[in-house]
């Protein structure tokens, strides 16, 4: 328990505690007077008895976050998330609040920090095209989301008493919906597409709701298009890996991601990154996606062409068993497909969208076809939760909204108007055929 000590006319509350690193330490807390010391002593003892006592710590925010990254980040973040989150910490957290004591960082300090971020120069300004001069609201939102997660762990580890990053005042973020093609626009694009690789990629992305990294990592052992599969309407893909380009220094840092293979892509300049074939993102489990017969036949024909090329090239062909690859068997990167797609749009004067938007179009179209079956759509897209489908992919197309308005008019307002008309005509017929009732109504109206 705590005790009160008077030393040279000053009062101290003295107590022992187990520190964050497991060591037994003694703490002396100075008080202004004896009354304050009594109050402080009782407060500490009550917190200990109620098991809410927090061991005092001089740990800085930077020190805590480094522990957080080591214990939490390496186990829960994918390669891309790890790079992005550590970048946010190095650029916008450590320089501004890294030396602050974590236990004394209050909700007021949080709002002051956010306000300071809005006036902080963007590290990419002048480096990347169209980068804003100051930290954008979306970046601030990402920083706060990361710190909210960190403080949640700090609360769990009994480092702080509350999560000060909950309900903080964020700057307004203007959310822009991603432009997507309608099914009609996709049909038109496929009709005029002469690039065989791009043609197949568009079909796979739209019909199977694939991410571009999953699409390019698809291997023939996960494609089921044999005759018996067609007979049973069981043509399908298994999605269990993806292609990503990562920093070479990241390999071996994380324990969460399993890297199956690294590729040397023979770039002209020395590169700090490497293309890897790896497991799915965010603890993603392998998923089965059933494919339309037309797409299955496309794949069957594509495989025949690929086998013919293998025979011609012989040992020159680098067989990685990839469905989408260059003629020599080497993998195609997402930037290659994105550039092809962008050029295809420009040459044919099509509405500008990015390749990833085909996945959005796919989810939207499947939701419409299934009349809102979110779980079935989620099974194809591979999203972690159904809520992500409703938030990200349930775009409402204007044509459907007009149809809904027309249906509402016909089913609600028009029917009501007809009912009112019917009621009036029915009453008139009753009066015509009932002389006594008609005379009684005349007398009532004359009063």
Residue ranges and their predicted role:
Residues 127-129, 173-198, 207-210, 272, ...:
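Long, amphipathic, Lys/Arg-enriched alpha-helical "connector/arm" segment
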Residues 6-108, 304-318, 398, 413, ...:
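N-terminal DNA-binding module of tyrosine recombinases/phage integrases
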Residues 1, 92, 103-108, 123-167, ...:
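N-terminal DNA-binding recognition helix of tyrosine site-specific recombinases/integrases
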Residues 111-113, 156-190, 327:
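Flexible interdomain linker/hinge and immediately adjacent N-terminus
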Residues 223-231, 236, 333, 352, ...:
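Short, polar N-cap/turn motifs at the start of nucleic acid-interacting alpha helices
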Residues 156, 203, 207, 214, ...:
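C-terminal catalytic core of tyrosine-transesterase DNA break-rejoin enzymes
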Residues 172, 180, 231-232, 243-245, ...:
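Catalytic-site neighborhood detector that most strongly recognizes the C-terminal catalytic loop/helix
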Residues 7, 185, 218-308:
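Conserved tyrosine-mediated DNA breakage-rejoining catalytic core shared by Y-recombinases
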